[in-house]
Structure formats: C-alpha cells, structure tokens
C-alpha cells in the first residue's frame, strides 16, 4: 500500500500534471467556482450491507468507485487491499465559491476605498480617554494662561507636552500659595480682637449694656500683699 502511495505522489507526477482543477468564472458577479473533486466521502446504507460480499469476491471484481477521480488517485483502486475509500457525488451546493472583494476586481469602476477606519485609533487619539489629559482645576489660572496658549500652536506633541507641564506647575504654585496663607492665618489671630468683633456683632440689649457699664465702672482688683496686711472685701453693691 505504501508503494502505491509513493508511486502516486512521486512516480506518476507526469500523468497527474495534465489534470488540473477546473475553474468556472462568471465575470458579471465576480464569483469563481472551484471544482477540484466532484465527489465527497461517505458511506451509504447499501454499501455497508455489501461490505461482506465485497470482501469475499475476487479483487478484480471491485466496483469502479474511483472512476470520477483523477489519474493520480486511480492507483488507490488496486484490489490487493480492502477498499477503504468510497466517494459519492456531491451536490452543487457543496462546491467552493471564492469571491474576492469588488475593490480588487472591479478596477476603477468601484467607489469603495480600502482605508483604515478612524474608530481603530479611538483609544489612542480621543482626548477624553488620554492618560495625560489635564482637568481644569485652576479656573483663575486658565484665564491668565489663555493668551500664552494661543501663541503656541498645539500642532506638535512636544509643544503640547510643554503646555501641560506648564499648567501643572502653575496649579502647584497656586496650591502652595493658598496653603501657606492658610497656615499664616492662626499666627495673626488675636483673642482680644476676636472678642471685640464678637461683641460688636451681638445685638445691643438692656442686659448687655448694663454689663458693659459694670465692666467699665468696677475697680481693678488690688494686688495681694505677701505681708500681714489682711484685705477685706468691699461690700457688694449689686445683687446679680
């Protein structure tokens, strides 16, 4: 069996070179029908029943199941071994249809242009999905840097990188200045000034005016002496 296979692929190349696949072209629809082998493999129910009869018959009485095959495959019909390949006729629907796109076959008659879709580079070119996108967190600085952005055209990526770096620096400086001013506020805080402002903000009532007058009229406390002098408290003038 292996000798016949070797003879099929090596010895009988000249005989099989004359037979080539048939191509049926239809220029109108640009479809190409390729019929290399008109048959397909398969076993019918009747052939399964006849397998025992075929094995008992003589080798020369095999049916010509390879009649539809090329000459390169006819050597497999040698009856020294049992028949292991059987082919049936294939319907037309099981043939191969090879149709190239119209842009390759219609020449200049077609209006279809083969080009890359702009949606392919969406993740790279879209600014909203860029990693280096800077959100405007400094509205005051954006107005100040608007004039400088108009002078530099964002045509080259190097200029865009410089502009983004400048915006980062301006935002960092503004945040640092705000932080320092916030830290300096407690140093300038004075309790007396806060009390004065708080008292001025309060509404003037009868009791508040009376208390203010008492704080002004009362005498300061005398300094306690360390000697033997005993200081007696003065009588209370007001009961409250």
Curated annotation (Swiss-Prot):
Tissue: Ubiquitously expressed.
Motif (LIR): 25-37
UniProt superkingdom: Eukaryota
Inducing factors: By adriamycin, gamma irradiation and H(2)O(2), in a p53/TP53-dependent way. At lower levels by UV irradiation. By TP73.
A Pfam family of this chain: DOR
Keyword NADP: no
Residue ranges crossing the lipid bilayer per the database entry: none
Location of this chain's protein in the cell: Cytoplasm, Cytosol; Nucleus; Nucleus, PML body; Cytoplasmic vesicle, Autophagosome
Any one GO molecular-function label of the UniProt entry: antioxidant activity
GO biological process: apoptotic process; autophagic cell death; autophagosome assembly; cellular response to ethanol; cellular response to hydroperoxide; cellular response to methyl methanesulfonate; cellular response to UV; negative regulation of cell migration
Keyword Transferase recorded: no
Keywords in alphabetical order: Activator, Antioxidant, Apoptosis, Autophagy, Cytoplasm, Cytoplasmic vesicle, Nucleus, Transcription, Transcription regulation, Tumor suppressor
One cellular component (GO) term of this entry: nucleus
InterPro entries per record: TP53INP
Subunit structure: Interacts with p53/TP53 and HIPK2. Interacts with PRKCG, GABARAP, GABARAPL1, GABARAPL2, MAP1LC3A, MAP1LC3B and MAP1LC3C.
Domain notes: The LC3 interacting region (LIR) motif mediates interaction with GABARAP, GABARAPL1, GABARAPL2, MAP1LC3A, MAP1LC3B and MAP1LC3C.
Reported function: Antiproliferative and proapoptotic protein involved in cell stress response which acts as a dual regulator of transcription and autophagy. Acts as a positive regulator of autophagy. In response to cellular stress or activation of autophagy, relocates to autophagosomes where it interacts with autophagosome-associated proteins GABARAP, GABARAPL1/L2, MAP1LC3A/B/C and regulates autophagy. Acts as an antioxidant and plays a major role in p53/TP53-driven oxidative stress response.
Name of the protein described by the UniProt record: Tumor protein p53-inducible nuclear protein 1
Organism: Homo sapiens
């Amino acid at each position: 069996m292996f000798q016949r296979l070797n003879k099929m692929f090596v010895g009988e190349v000249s005989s099989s070179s004359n037979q080539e696949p048939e191509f049926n072209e239809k220029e109108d629809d640009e479809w190409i029908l390729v019929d290399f082998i008109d048959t397909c493999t398969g076993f019918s129910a009747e052939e399964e029943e006849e397998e025992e009869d075929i094995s008992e018959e003589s080798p020369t009485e095999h049916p010509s199941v390879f009649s539809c095959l090329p000459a390169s495959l006819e050597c497999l019909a040698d009856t020294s071994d049992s028949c292991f390949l059987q082919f049936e006729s294939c319907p037309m629907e099981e043939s191969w249809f090879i149709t190239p796109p119209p842009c390759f076959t219609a020449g200049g008659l077609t209006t279809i242009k083969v080009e890359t879709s702009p949606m392919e580079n969406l993740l790279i070119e879209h600014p909203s999905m860029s990693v280096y996108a800077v959100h405007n967190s400094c509205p005051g600085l954006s107005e100040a840097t608007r004039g400088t952005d108009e002078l530099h055209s964002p045509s080259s990526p190097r200029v865009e990188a410089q502009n983004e770096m400048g915006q980062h620096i301006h935002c960092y400086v503004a945040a640092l200045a705000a932080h320092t001013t916030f830290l300096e506020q407690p140093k300038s805080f004075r309790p007396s000034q806060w009390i004065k402002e708080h008292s001025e903000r309060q509404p003037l009532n009868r009791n508040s005016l009376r208390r203010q007058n008492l704080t002004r009229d009362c005498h300061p406390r005398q300094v306690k002496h360390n000697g033997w002098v005993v200081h007696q408290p003065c009588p209370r003038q007001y009961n409250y």
